[in-house]
């Protein structure tokens, strides 16, 4: 028989995370590595755990993630959104709680493109009066 699992996709900046929630005892695997091993920072670990802590689902699910692109902060944000969306599929009653906390909103902020004639997105070359 097929195992029950809930899927969620999260994106943030250039990062894309595919998250699977499987009924279990709260194990975290990100790209086949543990949470602390993958991120190495307590703050990023906290960001990833937020939806589970808010909904009191920490010991109910094993979290399996595949994430690629971007940096560590973007990846943590993408995983958080993926977990929140997967939790929603597991229990639709969690929607108001997750929505109020802002975990179901995709953060639209991304790197602004560089413009020609400038050194970066907005940084202009040094101006000399004389």
Swiss-Prot record:
Q: Where is the composition biased (Basic residues)?
A: 111-130
Q: Which UniProt keywords apply?
A: Ribonucleoprotein, Ribosomal protein
Q: Which gene encodes it?
A: rpsI
Please give the InterPro entries that the UniProt record associates with this protein: Ribosomal_Su5_D2-typ_SF, Ribosomal_uS9, Ribosomal_uS9_bac/plastid, Ribosomal_uS9_CS, Ribsml_uS5_D2-typ_fold_subgr
| UniProt-listed SUPFAM superfamilies | Ribosomal protein S5 domain 2-like
The protein in question is named Small ribosomal subunit protein uS9
Extract the ranges annotated as region (Disordered): 109-130
Q: Which organism is it from?
A: Heliobacterium modesticaldum (strain ATCC 51547 / Ice1)
Query: Which family is annotated?
Result: Belongs to the universal ribosomal protein uS9 family.
Database matches in HAMAP family: Ribosomal_uS9_B
Question: GO CC terms on record?
Answer: cytosolic small ribosomal subunit
Q: Does the keyword Ribosomal protein apply?
A: yes
Query: Example GO biological process term?
Result: translation
- A Pfam family of this chain: Ribosomal_S9
Write out the GO MF terms: RNA binding; structural constituent of ribosome
């Amino acid at each position: 028989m097929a195992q029950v699992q809930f899927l969620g996709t999260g994106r943030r900046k250039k990062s894309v995370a595919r998250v699977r929630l499987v009924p279990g005892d709260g194990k975290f695997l990100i790209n086949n590595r543990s949470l602390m091993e993958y991120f190495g920072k307590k703050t990023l670990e906290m960001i990833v755990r937020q939806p589970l802590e808010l909904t009191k689902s920490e010991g109910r699910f094993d979290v399996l993630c595949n994430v690629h692109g971007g940096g560590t902060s973007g990846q943590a944000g993408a995983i958080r959104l993926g977990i929140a969306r997967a939790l929603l599929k597991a229990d639709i009653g969690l929607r108001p709680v997750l929505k109020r906390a802002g975990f179901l909103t995709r953060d639209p902020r991304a790197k602004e493109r560089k413009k020609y004639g400038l050194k970066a997105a907005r940084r202009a070359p040094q101006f000399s009066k004389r």
